[in-house]
A protein has these predicted regions:
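Alpha-helical transmembrane bundles and membrane-interface segments of multipass inner-membrane proteins
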Residues: 1-163
């Protein structure tokens, strides 16, 4: 499988997983319902996020915020798609995870952009707690974007191996 095909396949899997889970949440839970999975640690919830990943930029005028966030997502999509298109057939030294990372980011960005364009908000449902600490609810797309960004950062920070 080519590196480009790997990226695009992973993006499609992330997009499909994101859509399936969001549709399930929207059809089985009323807004703000909670299902405790691990009490005090992990819940499944139904929330709508009008901002970015993890609730960032959720304040502000609705129309201008949605336009700005959709534009940012579109720029990210085009940039990542361009990087995928330019992937060399063989992995350059130190770039083993780049196709997977780009696929995760592309799939996650597509998933959240789909919600934002159709509904003006993104469905979030994964809710983590650690004692009194509470992480904002997130979804599969947010997770994929975060994991992809971490993989890219690790590849950039990892020293090149010498033969």
């Amino acid at each position: 499988m080519s590196r480009r095909t790997l990226s695009l396949t992973l993006a499609a899997v992330v997009l499909l997983g994101d859509r399936v889970t969001k549709v399930w949440i929207e059809s089985h839970l009323s807004f703000s319902d909670t299902i405790p999975v691990i009490p005090g640690v992990f819940n499944i919830v139904h929330t709508q996020n009008r901002g970015m990943a993890f609730g960032l930029f959720s304040n502000g005028a609705s129309a201008s915020r949605n336009l700005l966030l959709a534009a940012v997502a579109l720029v990210v999509l085009l940039f990542v798609a361009g990087l995928i298109w330019r992937l060399p057939p063989q992995a350059p030294r130190g770039q083993r995870f780049t196709p997977a990372a780009l696929g995760l980011i592309l799939g996650g960005a597509l998933g959240n952009l789909y919600d934002r364009l159709l509904k003006g908000s993104v469905t979030d449902f994964l809710d983590l707690h650690a004692g009194s600490l509470h992480w904002p609810a997130f979804n599969i797309a947010d997770s994929a974007i975060t994991i992809g960004a971490v993989l890219l950062a690790l590849e950039l920070l990892r020293p090149a191996h010498r033969d």
